[in-house]
């Protein structure tokens, strides 16, 4: 009896551990977090030259951690005046080149990732931030793209190479290129992200305020996913209660 009881307990423990593993595996594969890819085209000379060469609508790519694009990173010029003083930067859509050029056209893409991938993205970006002074712009890599030959140098990136590198290192499956060959157009034609806005960058936050609800903390709620479903459920309950009170 004791042996049978012990065997049953062992089976229960094994079954419990198996269920926990299944739950953890499901959590690791569920895409519950978002990052954002901003594709843009300003009226600067480098942007116009790139557009003329590529014949593509966008010449620059950035990676953001929030829908308002408040925390956003890329490789670009560090100041407004000197186009050759470039490196890893934190971008602001209301300052710098974006703030100066109110006619900047853009495309905002939302990419759902797993919690584990999101954690890795944050870790990679933190490394970039800590070593910011080491990074330069991969000018030679741009010519490599023209020749279809990836030129990847440590601490040197161009904008779309940087975005691809971060996502790729975090385990996000993309379009099977080397980071040194990634172009803004690749993100535009990639079918994984959702298009949430296309138009003038200057009007983007106004668009958000008119089309996205906010939670009690003043943060925009995604229009798909668990948070938005919960928001809609809460709104439905409130509407039912209001209707009942009026009857």
Predicted regions and their residues:
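Cysteine-nucleophile amide-bond enzymes
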Residues: 2-247
């Amino acid at each position: 009896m004791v042996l049978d009881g012990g065997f049953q307990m062992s089976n229960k423990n094994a079954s419990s551990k198996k269920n926990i593993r299944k739950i953890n595996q499901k959590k690791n594969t569920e895409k519950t977090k978002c990052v954002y890819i901003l594709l843009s085209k300003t009226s600067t000379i480098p942007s116009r030259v790139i557009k003329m060469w590529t014949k593509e609508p966008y010449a620059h790519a950035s990676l953001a951690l929030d829908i308002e694009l408040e925390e956003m990173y890329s490789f670009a010029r560090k100041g407004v005046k000197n186009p050759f003083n470039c490196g890893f930067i934190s971008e602001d859509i209301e300052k710098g080149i974006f703030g100066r050029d109110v006619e900047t056209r853009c495309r905002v893409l939302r990419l759902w990732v797993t919690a584990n991938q999101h954690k890795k993205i944050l870790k990679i970006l933190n490394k970039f931030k800590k070593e910011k002074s080491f990074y330069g712009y991969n000018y030679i890599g741009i010519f490599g793209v023209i020749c279809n030959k990836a030129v990847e140098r440590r601490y040197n990136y161009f904008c779309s190479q940087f975005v691809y590198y971060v996502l790729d290192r975090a385990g996000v499956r993309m379009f099977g290129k080397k980071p040194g060959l990634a172009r803004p157009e690749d993100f535009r034609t990639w079918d994984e992200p959702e298009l949430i806005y296309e138009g003038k960058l200057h009007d983007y936050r106004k668009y958000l305020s008119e089309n996205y609800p906010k939670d009690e903390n003043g943060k925009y709620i995604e229009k798909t996913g668990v948070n938005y479903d919960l928001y809609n459920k809460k709104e439905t309950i409130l509407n039912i209660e209001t209707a009942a009170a009026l009857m």
